[in-house]
Structure formats: C-alpha cells, structure tokens
C-alpha cells in the first residue's frame, strides 16, 4: 500500500531490561481523508499485531529488537504498505499520518455471467476450513473489552488481557460448547458493575459467549442449497496484494463474506440481524425482546494458516412494561476481542486450574496492574471511548475505579 507520510512518532520505553518501541499513527484514505477503521497493523513474518480504531488511529507496542523488521499495514480494498520500522522513526512528538491509496480496479473484478456464483464460492470456502485454518494446537494472546449501555448512557466497562488455547479448527460435535481454554492474565473493571441495571444483562461469562460467535470455528453457516442460491457475488476487491471474492446475502439477515481467491480462505465477514419480536426473558414486571445483533470477524494469515485477528459484536435488548407494553429502556452490550500475538504449533497448554471460570469476568478480577497495561496492545481510544469515560467518571476517575 502506498502511503504519504506526513508526520511521525516513535519512542522507546524501558521497563526493567525490556525495551518497547511504540508506533502511534493514523491511517486514512488519501483521496477522501476519511479514517480507515480496523486496518491491520503488524510486523512482516512475525506473530504480533494490532488494529486501527474507528478513527483509523493506533498505538502499536513492539519489542525494540524489531526495529529492522518490516512494518505492514493492510486494509481491504487497498494495497499493502511495507517499510522498515527504523525508517518510520521520528522525534517530532506527533502521531504519523498514513494516507492510503485504493487499489486500482482490475479487469478480473468484472463479474462475468458464466463464472462461479456467490453460493459456489461460499460452498468451496466452507469445505476448505480445515485446509486454511490451524489443525495443530495454538495459542492466542489477546485483549478483550465489553461495555454496557442503558438508554444511551454507558454504565460499565471491563477489559482483560487473555491467553487462549485451542487444539485445532476441526468441526466441533457441539457448536454451543466452548472448545478453547482461556487464561485470564489481567482484568480491570469500572465500578459500574455494581449498578442496578447490570442485572438486566447476561451474568454469565461474556467472553465465552463471544468466542462461541466465531462462525468459522463453530461452523455457524447455513449450507443448504436454498441458502447458497440466495448468496450473491459482488465486485471483487483486493487485500494483502491479491484479489478477494466478495459474496453477500440479504434475505432475513445481512451477511458479507470476503474470501481469498488463491485458496478460498475466509478472511473477513460481517453479519447483522434485526429485531425478532420474540420475548427473551421476564423480570420484575417487565419482559425483554431481542432488538438486533451486529458482528464483524477478521482473520490474519500467519505461517500459511488463518488466525482470528479481531472480532466485535454489538447486541441490543429492549425492556417493556408487562402491563402497558410500553418501552421502559433499551440496553446495548458491545464486545471486542483483539489478538495481538499468535503462537502456532505450541507445546504449551492451559491447565484446568488456570482456566477462567464459566461465570462473569467481573467476579474474576484481580489487583490492578498499572505498569502492565501501560505497554499492552489495546485498541486505541476514540471520541466514542471518551463518551464512555465521561459517563463512567461521573463519580470518580476510571483509573481510581480500576484500583478499587
């Protein structure tokens, strides 16, 4: 990807003997100057990475020994940017602005009537999951966050550094039982988990629920003929220097899947469902209905296999008065998982005694480790995050809430 570098920032921090390089930047479209959210930021051939936030911004912490490695920024529809880490170093004190050019339109992007249909492409992709995804044990280091909102006001925040072990991407016998083993490295939360409205959210382990939403890992795709016939092929795009199939489904729910033309690996998917009207639960003279779900899952290739890169899920539940059927309040749960390190073919396991429990992470927190979080790859805050902070800090600063 060709970038125009406007200004830059890169500094080295020391914690004991360990040195960390931090690259701060902004990725945006060169022509429109619009930010590019969830672009992948990584080191070529290495297992670490992060993603840009909704404003295209990122802070990428990496070992100082990587200064001679190649920084890579990838985005669907754009050509890759690659440059040595040392070459983007600057002491100006300002984040670097990366202006990205879209990939040129190719003749192959024109869909010909006698080529593969969208359903054909998706069918092949689903049949090749075990070829394209890891079939040996692996570890993922990641950052998890969830926020809860009631009537437009954020009431709680929870963040965790996690380690995830999985045997492989073999199709599970039970798609509703978590196969991964998760170890909690650090957990921090706001005091909002004591808010009276938290009882109107699921009290189970929400990270476990999120992992079970991985459509590829848990084979959560319809694959009958009627469904596949409804899948449409869209104009091809580009990612990581090669062409990508794009297929969509619009009946009853929205689905958009990006599939690598070289090997039919699913690299990205987006899905959204609307209100169903079905009653979810009843409580204290009220009942709740499902108001919709929006999900994004992104994968990144490492050593020839696809590993989850990031995942976001937004789910909405509305609560009504049982007697009058009037809307009392709306709730929204937002969850995100960023994978910042992959360890393939691992010999390390997560023991049963180390596994997170199946109840809520808010009950599994531990003393706040400020030094750890200072150099940990999280998703950079946005103005939306600052709205979250404003809501949560009405009593005391969030940092103090973490410490408490």
Where do the model's predicted regions map?
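A short, solvent-exposed loop/turn motif at the edges and junctions
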Residues: 72-83
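Short Pro-Gly-centered beta-turn/loop motif in secreted/extracellular proteins
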Residues: 33, 60-68
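Structural motif
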Residues: 22-36
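Bacterial Sec-dependent N-terminal signal peptides
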Residues: 1-26, 41, 107, 403-404
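Short, acidic Ser/Thr/Gly-rich low-complexity loop/linker segments typical of extracellular
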Residues: 47-57
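Surface-exposed, low-complexity/disordered segments
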Residues: 82, 96-230, 237-242, 286-404
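Extended beta-strand-rich segments in extracellular/periplasmic secretory proteins, especially
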Residues: 216-271
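Hydrophobic beta-strand segments
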Residues: 39-43, 56, 71, 112
């Amino acid at each position: 990807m060709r970038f125009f570098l406007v200004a830059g920032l890169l500094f080295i921090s020391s914690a004991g003997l360990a040195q960390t390089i931090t690259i701060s930047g902004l990725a945006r479209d060169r022509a429109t100057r619009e930010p590019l959210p969830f672009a992948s930021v990584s080191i070529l051939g290495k297992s670490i990475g992060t993603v840009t936030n909704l404003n295209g911004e990122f802070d990428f912490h990496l070992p100082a020994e990587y200064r001679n490695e190649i920084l890579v920024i990838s985005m669907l529809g754009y050509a890759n940017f690659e440059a040595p880490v040392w070459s983007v170093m600057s002491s100006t004190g300002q984040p670097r602005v990366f202006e990205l050019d879209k990939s040129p339109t190719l003749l192959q992007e024109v869909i010909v009537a006698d080529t593969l249909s969208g359903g054909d492409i998706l069918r092949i992709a689903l049949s090749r999951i075990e070829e394209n995804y890891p079939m040996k044990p692996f570890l993922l280091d990641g950052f998890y966050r969830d926020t809860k909102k009631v009537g437009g006001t954020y009431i709680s925040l929870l963040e965790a550094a996690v380690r995830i072990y999985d045997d492989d991407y073999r199709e599970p016998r039970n798609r509703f039982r978590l196969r991964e083993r998760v170890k909690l490295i650090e957990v921090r939360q706001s005091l909002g988990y004591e808010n009276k409205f938290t009882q109107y959210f699921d009290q189970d382990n929400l990270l476990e629920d999120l992992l079970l939403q991985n459509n590829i890992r848990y084979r959560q795709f319809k694959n009958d003929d009627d469904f596949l016939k409804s899948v449409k092929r869209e104009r091809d795009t580009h990612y990581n220097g090669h062409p990508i199939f794009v297929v969509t489904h619009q009946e009853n729910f929205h689905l958009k899947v990006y599939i690598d033309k070289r090997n039919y690996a699913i690299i990205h998917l987006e899905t959204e469902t609307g209100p169903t009207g079905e009653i979810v639960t009843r409580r204290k003279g009220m009942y709740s209905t499902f108001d919709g779900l929006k999900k994004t899952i992104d994968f990144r290739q490492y050593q020839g296999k696809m590993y989850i890169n990031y995942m976001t899920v937004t789910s909405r539940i509305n609560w009504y008065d049982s007697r009058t059927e009037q809307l009392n309040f709306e709730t929204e749960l937002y969850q995100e998982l960023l994978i910042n390190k992959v360890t393939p073919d691992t010999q390390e396991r997560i023991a049963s005694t180390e596994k997170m429990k199946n109840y809520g992470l808010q009950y599994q927190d531990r003393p706040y480790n400020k030094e750890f979080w200072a150099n940990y790859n999280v998703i950079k805050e946005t103005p939306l995050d600052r709205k979250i902070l404003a809501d949560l800090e009405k009593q005391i600063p969030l940092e103090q809430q973490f410490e408490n």
